[in-house]
Amino acid sequence: MQLTSQAFSYGRPIPKKYSCQGVGISPPLSFSDVPREAKSLVLIVEDPDVPPSVREDGLWIHWIVYNLSPVVSNLAEGAQIFAVQGLNTAGEIGYCPPCPPDAKHRYYFYAYALDVVLSDEEGVTKEQLLEAMDGHIIATAELMGTYEKD
């Protein structure tokens, strides 16, 4: 399975329009080579470079989307999501744009193909979602972009 974006390549800067200094909309994403047996897709976006003074665990969850149809091949920028969304670290549902407080940060977009459709309960945490996904992951993909404020 592969996860790519028309807006940035792996390891390259995420354009400003997708950050807190821009419009703050989600970037376009494309899923390919999804296994035929997949029943749903999950997307988790996180920043592992958060200073300990901001978050002790150094991790910020920017977006959680699950129960995406496995036949979805693209999410347009700022797309309305026809799936279930979980809580980001800000305690909100939806995309939280990159806004690093100190330096360049890495933003990992993780895609998972599952052999099940999960509960439609909205607002779960990453930990709750990972627990529900346990034993059901049949493929994964990763995309990483960076962002640093001007």
UniProtKB/Swiss-Prot annotation:
CDD domains found in the cross-reference section: PEBP_bact_arch
Q: Where are the transmembrane segments?
A: none
Q: Which Gene3D superfamilies match?
A: PEBP-like (3.90.280.10)
What's the protein name?
UPF0098 protein CT_736
NCBIfam families with a match to the protein in the record: YbhB/YbcL family Raf kinase inhibitor-like protein
InterPro entries per record: PEBP, PEBP-like_sf, YbhB_YbcL/LppC-like
Query: Would you indicate the residue range of the signal peptide?
Result: none
The record's family statement is: Belongs to the UPF0098 family.
Query: What is the organism field in this record?
Result: Chlamydia trachomatis serovar D (strain ATCC VR-885 / DSM 19411 / UW-3/Cx)
